[in-house]
């Protein structure tokens, strides 16, 4: 389907430097689609970046959006869409509100395996005036098209691979242990967690491992579908303020909190955590639920803090 005649491509400088942008723009040109590029998205997106992107969209008479890059460009494209159709001056005016007005058509092309923003109804933007990280949500924020091609993740550095992979793991574990979990989200969550346990260390050690990169891209996609339906829990609730106040990348703040927050939640969901322990193979069927649950948390620690050497809250 044709989304429009002129696109605003929301991205970061890394996509241009790595040569990925040419692959996208060549296809647009071959199909007679005009475009302008907003490549100012860096780090955690802010309300200022969103306002600048919205101005570029309207000044150039664009009629659809392409988010191309990691979670930040994808989230930014969603927020720009909200701003250009909402009639307000700053995206922070939407803080705490459910977005219901349709945004322009959005295609999402992730270059990391983490946020799952290509399929979610969420966008996280920093409010620079109030020093908070806003979470905006609404079904209208789900991209019309998601193009998940692991080739775009092959050049991600180890630090990004680790941080984004732990974000996907956090999504899946929190979705599975959420009170809003459903049989459908359970299937996607278990599938994502098993992939991440197996393939994230491999993708981290060898970024050119095609099988590992593909598996991680699918896992992030699956975990994104999960949180659309069963949401997240304590880790994300605590990590957003850390990101806003100390400008810590989202995946890193999740990793810092992951074991401590899940340990706190463990006693209320031994059976759920035990199932994850057995499904990932770190616990056996002869283990009690309590033992299997603790073994699962030990497995998370092995992946997060041993294989990937990510920081803990301590």
Task: Map each language-model feature to its residues.
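ATP/NTP phosphate-donor binding region
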Residues: 1-64
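Glycine/threonine-rich beta-strand-loop-alpha-helix active-site module
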Residues: 48-55, 59-150
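Glycine-rich phosphate/pyrophosphate-binding beta-alpha loops
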Residues: 114, 221, 225-234, 239-248
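Carboxylate- and glycine-rich phosphate/diphosphate-binding segment that chelates Mg2+/Mn2+
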Residues: 122-230
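Catalytic phosphate/nucleotide-handling subdomain of diverse soluble enzymes
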Residues: 241-275
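A structural-propensity feature for long, helix-poor, extended segments
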Residues: 261, 265-304
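Conserved small/polar residues in nucleotide/adenosyl-binding loops
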Residues: 306-312
């Amino acid at each position: 389907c044709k989304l429009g005649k002129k696109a605003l491509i929301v991205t970061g400088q890394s996509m241009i430097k790595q040569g990925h942008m040419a692959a996208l723009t060549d296809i647009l040109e071959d199909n007679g689609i005009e475009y302008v590029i907003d490549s100012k998205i860096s780090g955690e997106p802010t309300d200022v970046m969103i306002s600048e992107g919205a101005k570029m969209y309207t000044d150039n008479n664009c009629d659809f959006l392409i988010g191309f890059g990691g979670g930040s460009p994808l989230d930014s494209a969603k927020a720009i869409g909200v701003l250009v159709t909402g009639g307000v001056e700053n995206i922070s005016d939407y803080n705490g509100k459910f977005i219901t007005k349709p945004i322009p058509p959005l295609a999402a092309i992730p270059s990391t395996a983490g946020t799952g923003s290509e399929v979610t109804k969420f966008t996280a933007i920093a409010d620079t005036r109030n020093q908070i990280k806003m979470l905006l949500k609404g079904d209208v924020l789900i991209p019309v098209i998601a193009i998940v091609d692991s080739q775009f993740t092959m050049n991600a550095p180890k630090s990004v691979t680790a941080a984004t992979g732990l974000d996907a793991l956090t999504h899946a574990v929190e979705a599975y242990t959420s009170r809003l979990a459903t049989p459908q989200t359970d299937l996607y969550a278990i599938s994502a967690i098993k992939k991440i346990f197996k393939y994230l260390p491999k993708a981290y050690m060898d970024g050119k491992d095609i099988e590992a990169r593909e598996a991680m891209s699918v896992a992030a996609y699956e975990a994104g579908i999960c949180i659309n339906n069963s949401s997240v829990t304590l880790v994300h609730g605590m990590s957003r303020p850390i990101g806003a106040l100390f400008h810590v990348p989202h995946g890193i703040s999740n990793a810092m909190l992951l074991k401590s927050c899940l340990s706190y939640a463990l006693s209320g969901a031994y059976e759920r955590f035990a199932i994850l322990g057995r499904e990932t193979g770190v616990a056996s069927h002869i283990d009690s639920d309590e033992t299997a649950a603790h073994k699962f948390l030990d497995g998370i620690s092995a992946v997060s803090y041993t294989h990937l050497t990510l920081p803990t809250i301590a």
